[in-house]
Structure formats: structure tokens, C-alpha cells
Amino acid sequence: MAHLLSASCPSVISLSSSSSKNSVKPFVSGQTFFNAQLLSRSSLKGLLFQEKKPRKSCVFRATAVPITQQAPPETSTNNSSSKPKRVMVIGGDGYCGWATALHLSKKNYEVCIVDNLVRRLFDHQLGLESLTPIASIHDRISRWKALTGKSIELYVGDICDFEFLAESFKSFEPDSVVHFGEQRSAPYSMIDRSRAVYTQHNNVIGTLNVLFAIKEFGEECHLVKLGTMGEYGTPNIDIEEGYITITHNGRTDTLPYPKQASSFYHLSKVHDSHNIAFTCKAWGIRATDLNQGVVYGVKTDETEMHEELRNRLDYDAVFGTALNRFCVQAAVGHPLTVYGKGGQTRGYLDIRDTVQCVEIAIANPAKAGEFRVFNQFTEQFSVNELASLVTKAGSKLGLDVKKMTVPNPRVEAEEHYYNAKHTKLMELGLEPHYLSDSLLDSLLNFAVQFKDRVDTKQIMPSVSWKKIGVKTKSMTT
């Protein structure tokens, strides 16, 4: 199990048993402590274990191989003389979470990562692999320390285990929690019954535990929760930022904007939003829900500092996002896979803007009892528009880019009205990176650089919204 959770970590692992209550201690430039019990009683149980095994109290201690390179601490860009704010990044080993953790650390926040590393396990289970080779979380954090002098603490465990999460909260005492720690793929949630159940249990129960942890151990803590623009669906009216004012039968009220989720994943995000809104009202929690659009790109200033800091980039049909997938398809000469009519329109943003938006939300926290909703994207594109942009950019690089129409595996409108508001983050200072020719060139060149790592069998969609069933499905057969 430890091997699965940190498959690429060059570490020394020892196992000790104890009848006493396990304590949670952070990784700080060299050590990790995580509780194996939490995995056996969490939502990971069905994914990790093929048969029931006796439970025992144990603690894994993994000591990362030390890195000798050391740099002096970087001068802070934060002019405040007060104690640096402490930010817990849940899901900090993932695509958006890793980039965010590094960005906040560089900005002089005290950062810890909480992660069960299950995203890496999904790759093992489904036969998938990031386009980019990624280092273990232990090597990543050690390299960051060596290059910048800044420490990132690491708590390896499952937030669906409240005891683990509570101990992490009490140990780190965060001022803000950035919550990326959810199963984030709509196709994954539609593979079969077990993945649908896992997605909803992991996401909804995990977020509930975070809310209870804030209530019990950090009532002033600000929750920055990553939601999704997919909560709204594709209504035939403008999409507002979280709330809409309605006049009905002569009476007017401002209400939460209607939700029309299109997968079990998106539904889990809707449930999260309702639970967070309720606890803000009932308990006075302060929360910001960032309804994020589709993220593209892989490079940030921090992840480009060293190859061991490199972020993952998914190109497969389960975890890959549209623009990233198209660029990889173009790089290997595979026709761009346009689902259905290709008129599906969504909000998009560069990963550099993801980290910027999170920083803005932390620096401008919600008030006590306030449930604040920001729509987090910078531009809108249809699938056909993205395909045209990639085709044009690819031709400049000498790539022969073609397009193919694929029967849509999803249940969604393929031609529709779409106009979503996204002004609140701009008003707070977001400086967006718009999709430009130079950015597309960079992303395409990056895909070409690693094209030998592409498994073309993973490009075509194999998950159907209508064919989901009870039987557990293997993606490798």
C-alpha cells in the first residue's frame, strides 16, 4: 500500500506497531508520517484492497533521500511585517494543487500540503500516465526546499478520515484552507457504479469533514473551495456569479443560481456548495467558492525552476482537459477528437491564473458567515473554436493537424447559448493570461518535446454516460 501511494518515492520505509493513539506529524524537509488506519476505513477502501485484511494500528515513516543542494531563502514579496499567513492546501500533489502550493510558498505564505496521493493510484489502476514525468511528492518538496530555502509541510492521509484531518488542523493551525482535494474528473465518475460512489463519497464527505474541522479547530479560518462552472450547466440565460435576483408574482428575492450538473462529479460539487452555504449561515464560517472553468497549460514560474518541480499534464480521455488534449493529439499526429457538433462552450483559464485567483481569494477573505462565489475563468471558447486555434498554431510549427468528429460520449447540449459573468476576481486585481498564439506555440512545443511518452490508445473516449453500469470496469481492456 505504501508503495502504491508513493510509487516513485526513493525512500526508506519502516513499519512500527503501537497500541497507542497515532499522532499526525508533518513532513518538513525530509520526513513524512502518515496513518495507515485511515486508508482502511476511508472511501479508499474499495479502491485499495482486493480482500479484507486484519486491521492493526500502525504508522508508516518514510524518510526521503536528502538533497544536498541548498539555496538561501528568497526575499519575500510580502511587505507586511506580521507573521506569515498559514495556508493548508488540500490536494496539493495534484495538477492545480501543486502549482498553487509552490506559488503561495514563493509569496511567503507558510504552506502545508494534505494529500492521500490517490491521484497517482488512479493512473496505476487505469493504465494512464502523465505526459510529463513527475517526481514523488517527497522529492518535489525536498527540491523546493533546496532551491528556495522554503519548507512545505506534508501530511499524507485521507480527509475522509476525520481523526487524521483533525490532527492535521491542530498541528498546522491554518489561517486559510485551499481545498483541491476531490476526485475532479467527470468521465472518471461515469466509468461504473463504484467510481460514481467513490466520487460522491470522497468529495462530499471530505468537504463536510473540512467544514467540521474549521468549526472545531479554526473558526476564523477562511475556506477557499474549488468548485466548477459545470455546476451551472448551460442555461439559456446569462450565468451570474453564484446568485441571481428574481422577481416572481410581484415579489423579488436574491437566490442561489440554479444548478444543472451533468455528471456524478458535477453533482458532488453542487452538494458541496449547498453544504458550505448552509454552514456559513449556521456556524458563521467564512468561505469562497471558486467556480473554476477548464484549466489549460502546465507551466508556472515555480514549476519551471527544476524538472523535479514539473507539473503533471493529462492528455487521456478520462482526466485530460480539452485544450491540453488537443495539443497532445496535434503533436503526435492524431486527429483532434471533437465530440458531437463541437458547439459545447465553456469558460477557460491558464493554470497561471488559477494560482493567481487562489492567492487573490486568500488575500481578500470572505467575512464571517459569508458564502462568496466567484466564477473563475478568463475566456469562453467552443470546442470547435479550440480545434481551429490548435490547427492554425500547429500548421505554423509544421504539424499536419486534422479534426475528426467523435460520437459524443456525454449527455450534454452540443449547440447552446453561453454567457457567464466573471467580474469579481478581475475587480480584485486578477491580471489574466489570455490564450495567445505564443502560449499555444509553447504548449504545442511542450507536447512535441514529450510526444514519445504518449500512449495513443488513451486518446479516444471509452467512458459513456449512457452505458455506465454496476459491473466494475477495467480501462485497460
From Swiss-Prot:
For this entry, the protein name equals UDP-sulfoquinovose synthase, chloroplastic
Q: How is its activity regulated?
A: Concentrations above 100 uM sulfite inhibit the reaction.
* Family statement drawn from the similarity comment of this UniProt entry: Belongs to the NAD(P)-dependent epimerase/dehydratase family.
What species does this protein belong to?
Arabidopsis thaliana (Mouse-ear cress)
Q: Which InterPro entries match?
A: Epimerase_deHydtase, NAD(P)-bd_dom_sf
Q: How does activity depend on pH?
A: Optimum pH is 7.5-9.5.
Description of what induces expression: Induced in response to altered availability of inorganic phosphate.
An example Gene Ontology biological process: glycolipid biosynthetic process
| Keyword Calcium recorded | no
What residues does the transit peptide encompass? 1-86
Q: Mutating T228A: what's the consequence?
A: Loss of activity
Q: Keywords in UniProt for this one? A: Chloroplast, Hydrolase, NAD, Plastid, Transit peptide
Instruction: Return the annotated region ranges for Disordered.
Output: 1-21
| Annotated NAD(+) binding sites | Y95, C96, D115, N116, L117, V118, R119, D158, I159, R184, N202, Y265, K269, V295
Active site residues according to the UniProt entry: T228, Y265 (proton acceptor), K269
